[in-house]
């Protein structure tokens, strides 16, 4: 992603946090690739003013931190009302009402870190990515080119990290559901009888 500088600098402890910009996934992807926390906000939560516009209808600021505690601390500072709208397409346009950051944010982001904060939330994890879908990648001629539609063999060290993450989510009150992933199956034809985007 285009925010790799922010991601790698934060991961290497060159700074306590980084500020990336995202249009598609260029804020989240560097965080995922460097083991960081990232937050992609809704429109108006973090001011975009002053950033280089790539696609003004999609651009958002994405902070990077090494821990969730750091992220919550940072959000308490950077999620603030910005009275100046020049340079911020969404807050400047008159047709879609964008609430002020103060109307959306909690009194304290740090207060969100309690043990039951995910109670009632459900996370869906595609079985094909955690070696739990025996049909994934078994089509006679899978995919639409390149490695698409082929079996994903996730290595044991990543599965161990997944199991730790799953335990943490459940401990925080979340429900974790292992599920199929029709978007990939029906696009890439990854199993016998599955269509592809070309069919």
Predicted regions mapped to residue ranges:
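A short helix-breaking turn/cap at a secondary-structure junction
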Residues: 40-160
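Extracellular/periplasmic catalytic domains that process cell-envelope and extracellular macromolecules
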Residues: 10-11, 30, 40, 114-119, ...
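Charged, often glycine-rich, active-site loop that binds/positions anionic groups
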Residues: 187-199
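Flexible loop/turn segments at secondary-structure boundaries
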Residues: 24-28, 60-61, 130-134, 184-188
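Active-site-proximal alpha-helical scaffold in enzymes
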Residues: 1-29, 64-68, 72-75
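General small-molecule cofactor/ligand-binding pocket signal
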Residues: 175-182
């Amino acid at each position: 992603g285009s925010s790799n500088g922010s991601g790698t600098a934060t991961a290497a402890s060159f700074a306590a946090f980084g500020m990336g910009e995202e249009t598609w996934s260029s804020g989240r992807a560097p965080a995922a690739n460097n083991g960081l926390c990232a937050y992609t906000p809704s429109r108006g939560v973090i001011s975009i003013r002053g950033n280089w516009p790539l696609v003004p209808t999609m651009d958002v600021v994405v902070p990077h931190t090494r821990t969730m505690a750091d992220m919550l601390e940072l959000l308490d500072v950077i999620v603030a009302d910005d009275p100046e709208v020049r340079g911020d397409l969404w807050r400047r346009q008159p047709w879609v009402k964008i609430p002020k950051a103060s109307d959306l944010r909690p009194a304290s982001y740090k207060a969100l870190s309690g043990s039951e904060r995910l109670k009632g939330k459900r996370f869906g994890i595609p079985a094909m990515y955690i070696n739990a879908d025996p049909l994934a990648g078994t089509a006679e001629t899978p995919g639409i080119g390149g490695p698409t539609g082929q079996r994903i063999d996730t290595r044991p060290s990543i599965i161990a990290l997944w199991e730790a993450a799953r335990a943490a989510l459940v401990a925080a009150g979340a429900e974790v559901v292992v599920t199929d992933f029709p978007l990939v199956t029906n696009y890439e034809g990854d199993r016998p009888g599955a269509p592809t985007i070309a069919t």
